[in-house]
């Protein structure tokens, strides 16, 4: 079987009427049909990208007239907004709520992954803070483990401390950041910008998934975060 490798090419997007290629009357074998379908797909995609590109350019032109700062500052502010809008659209395209409404298993796994990510983030954050203050973290780990277990997260108990089995990074952040970086790489050149986009990605994801928790006994990500913060503050405030 012939292996076809597609290599990326740099090209300029131009607004034009896209006309899908017509299938020839001869050589109607399966390989030809597959290649034709791929070509037509990319023609349509090219047209959609052209429209989106022109839309962004028009937005830039109209918004710049209302900006009171320097030209460079205006471009920076506008571009950040465009990147964030792109990330928001990417999140809508993932359609977490739609997939969850059709697949209960997906909904359950999403809730567990989100709460496990909250647990992992704040466990690391507060453990580092407590250690810096010379506070023993063992009681803290035991208590937040119990909170995670009470929240309904699956996991295992080791050395009398419960740990969620899915603890780790938020699984939806990477697709948003990766897609935005691929389209706007020049906006990810500084650590400050990267951190800003990561914070924004996490924010819109947490807002998007809240409805998934409305019909279950699990706390929302925001409620679970507050539970972990309250536990940590108890140990911090008791520091001599």
Swiss-Prot record:
Q: Does the keyword Isomerase apply?
A: no
Which protein family is it in? Belongs to the GEF (guanine exchange factor) SopE family.
Q: Where does this protein reside within or beyond the cell?
A: Secreted
Q: Which InterPro entries match?
A: SopE, SopE-like_GEF_dom_sf, SopE_GEF_dom, SopE_N_dom
Its primary localisation, in coarse terms, equals secreted
Q: Which portions of the sequence form the region GEF catalytic domain?
A: 78-240
What does the record list as GO biological process?
A: actin cytoskeleton organization
The gene for this chain is: sopE
Physiological role: Acts in concert with other proteins to mediate cellular responses leading to bacterial internalization. Activator for both CDC42 and RAC1 by directly engaging these Rho GTPases and acting as potent guanine nucleotide exchange factor (GEF). This activation results in actin cytoskeleton rearrangements and stimulates membrane ruffling, promoting bacterial entry into non-phagocytic cells.
Q: What else is known?
A: Encoded within a lambda-like prophage region with similarity to GIFSY phages.
A GO cellular component annotation here is: extracellular region
What the entry lists under Gene3D superfamilies is as follows: SopE-like, GEF domain
Question: Which Pfam families would you find in this protein's record?
Answer: SecIII_SopE_N (PF05364), SopE_GEF (PF07487)
* Domain of life, source organism: Bacteria
User: What keywords sit in the KW lines?
Assistant: GTPase activation, Guanine-nucleotide releasing factor, Secreted, Virulence
Keyword Oxidoreductase assigned to the entry: answer is no
Name one molecular function that GO assigns to this entry: GTPase activator activity
Q: What is this protein called?
A: Guanine nucleotide exchange factor SopE
- Where do transmembrane segments lie in this chain? none
């Amino acid at each position: 079987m012939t292996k076809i490798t597609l290599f990326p090419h740099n090209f300029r997007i131009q607004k034009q009427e896209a006309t899908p290629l017509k299938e020839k009357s001869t050589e109607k074998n399966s390989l030809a049909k597959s290649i034709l379908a791929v070509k037509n797909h990319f023609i349509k995609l090219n047209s959609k990208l052209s429209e989106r590109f022109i839309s962004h350019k028009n937005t830039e032109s109209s918004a710049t007239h209302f900006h009171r700062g320097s030209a460079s500052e205006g471009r920076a502010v506008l571009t950040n907004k465009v990147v964030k809008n792109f990330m928001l659209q990417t999140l809508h395209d993932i359609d977490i709520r739609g997939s969850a409404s059709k697949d209960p298993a997906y909904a359950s796994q999403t809730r567990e992954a989100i709460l496990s990510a909250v647990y992992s983030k704040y466990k690391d954050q507060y453990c580092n803070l407590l250690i810096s203050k010379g506070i023993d973290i063992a009681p803290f780990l035991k208590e937040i483990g119990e909170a995670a277990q009470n929240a309904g997260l699956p996991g295992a108990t080791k050395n009398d401390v419960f740990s969620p089995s899915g603890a780790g990074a938020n699984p939806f952040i990477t697709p948003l950041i990766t897609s935005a970086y691929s389209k706007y790489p020049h906006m990810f050149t500084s650590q400050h910008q990267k951190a800003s986009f990561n914070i924004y990605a996490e924010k819109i994801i947490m807002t998007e998934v809240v409805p998934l928790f409305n019909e279950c006994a699990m706390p929302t990500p925001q409620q679970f975060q507050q539970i972990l913060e309250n536990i940590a503050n108890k140990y911090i405030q008791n520091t001599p």
